[in-house]
Regions:
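Acidic, Ser/Thr/Pro/Gly-enriched alpha-helical scaffold modules and adjacent low-complexity linkers
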Residues: 2-350
Length: 350
């Protein structure tokens, strides 16, 4: 178990009665850059008094999960009003780390000693369990990665955006940069974490950056990614077309394609057919979210099969060229979509 545990570190941020928030403890260690980012994310350091009990995000391939608690009397923590328990890990699993974070928070509230947190952390790293009669138990085996992938609702997204969902699907398929805005972090995280399910064949949640600030270091790290889904609570992000191809305003239920991306995102009959299939499947009250994801995935598979059939030989090793696509006389939007999809799937001869 020790060799495969994806957890990287555990840390503590405390807010004292003077209103100061300080990074007070960490095990084993984290970089100064990551510590600065986590202080920004924990909701104890800003002017805003809104406390977010749980947030998660990603920075340079490290996932962070922050559980924040108000200190209740009586407690072993004197002069502390709130604290954040910060876990970093290599895997995406909000439910797993929220549950473990709650257990460690109760432990710290009771004993006020980081050594007790370290005991629980090491127990999970080595044995996959952290058991306590008073503070609750946690078992790693209860939290499957696939469950985390399927936790959001595709049906809710389609219900909100209808046929415009095809813009999201196209952007994700072509590995475009999708930026999402909502002022409430909880709504933002719920929506953004669901988007990668539209491209289930990749099962790649590393594209997800659900909680971003308009901070230089964060934006530079984001720009280094090929395609992504990034969530912002600051509407000023709309004035940064250099970081998005598709902009989603969740409050207004509006999806905007950036001018520079309109050509590669041109829609045709193929897109209309896919859009109708998505809307029809998601609108069926008898279908679960899992079933809708399967329907979308099946359609994706059909498109990828068409793409694979365009390869000049049958060994699957040769690449598709623009000339091959032109020979097929596809309508321009379909040709463009297949061309850029071949590039995204690394099937294109450049």
């Amino acid at each position: 178990m020790a060799g495969t545990c994806p957890m990287l570190s555990v840390g503590l941020v405390e807010k004292d009665t003077n209103g100061d928030a300080l990074w007070v403890w960490c095990y084993p260690t984290i970089t100064a850059e990551l510590r600065e980012l986590l202080l920004r994310k924990c909701s104890l350091t800003g002017e805003n008094d809104v406390i977010h009990t749980f947030v998660f995000g990603q920075f340079r391939r490290t996932w962070y999960y922050i559980t924040t608690t108000q200190v209740q009397d009586p407690t072993a923590l004197s002069k502390v009003t709130h604290f954040s328990l910060v876990l970093t890990a290599k895997d995406f699993n909000p439910e797993k780390y929220a549950a473990f974070g709650r257990v460690l928070c109760r432990t710290y509230m009771k004993y006020g000693n980081p050594a007790r947190i370290m005991e629980g952390y090491i127990s999970v790293v080595t044995n996959g369990i952290c058991q306590s009669e008073e503070n609750g138990s946690f078992f790693t085996k209860d939290y499957d990665a696939k469950k985390a992938y399927l936790a959001g609702s595709v049906k809710d997204i389609v219900s909100q955006f209808g046929m415009e969902t095809i813009i999201l699907y196209t952007g994700l398929m072509l590995k475009k940069r999708v930026v999402v805005y909502h002022p409430h972090i909880e709504a933002l995280q719920e929506f953004t974490r669901t988007l990668p399910t539209f491209i289930w064949h990749r099962q790649d949640w590393s594209i997800l950056h659900p909680y971003m600030h308009l901070n230089h270091d964060e934006l530079e790290a984001l720009k280094a990614c090929t395609g992504y889904v990034a969530g912002f609570t600051d509407l000023k992000v709309i004035d940064r077309p250099d970081i998005y191809d598709v902009f989603v305003n969740l409050v207004e239920s509006e999806i905007i394609i950036a001018p520079h991306a309109k050509e590669t995102m041109a829609m045709g009959k193929l897109h209309k057919d896919i859009g109708q299939l998505i809307v029809q499947s998601a609108g069926d009250p008898d279908k679960s979210d899992g079933r809708v994801i399967k329907d979308i995935s099946q359609k994706t598979k059909e498109i990828l099969t068409i793409l694979a059939s365009l390869r000049p030989d049958e060994d699957g090793k040769s690449k598709i060229t623009l000339e091959i696509l032109k020979e097929r006389h596809f309508p321009p939007p379909t040709e463009s979509f297949l061309y850029h999809l071949a590039a995204a799937e690394q099937m294109l001869q450049i």
